Design a protein with these regions (language model features):
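Motif-centric detector for short Cys/His coordination patterns
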Residues: 1-94
Length: 94
């Protein structure tokens, strides 16, 4: 199953490399696009759940790494939740 990584820039300028167990993340994000914080988290949540389910269909178990990545994204996003103007930039899809 092909994995995909995506690099994001958080509202404070820090960057993070993120993991997806499936290329489905490419259907939810466009490199160079900025997303409102809540929209970014929802897209990541849906993409990572779909990717995890694809792993389940193929191997019989969900992808714990996808759920770990989602937890990291949600924790990082929480830091900026009080800023209604917060945006996340998807730097690149790898």
């Amino acid at each position: 199953m092909p994995v995909m990584h995506f690099r994001v820039q958080w509202p404070d300028g820090t960057e993070a490399n993120c993991y997806s167990p499936s290329t489905v993340v490419g259907e939810f994000f466009v490199a160079g696009q900025r997303y409102a914080l809540g929209d970014f988290v929802e897209r990541a949540r849906e993409a990572l759940h779909i990717g995890s389910e694809r792993v389940r269909e193929k191997y019989g178990f969900a992808c714990s790494a996808a759920m770990d990545q989602l937890a990291q994204i949600e924790a990082q996003a929480e830091r900026f939740a009080s800023d209604p103007q917060a945006k996340v930039n998807v730097v690149e899809l790898l």
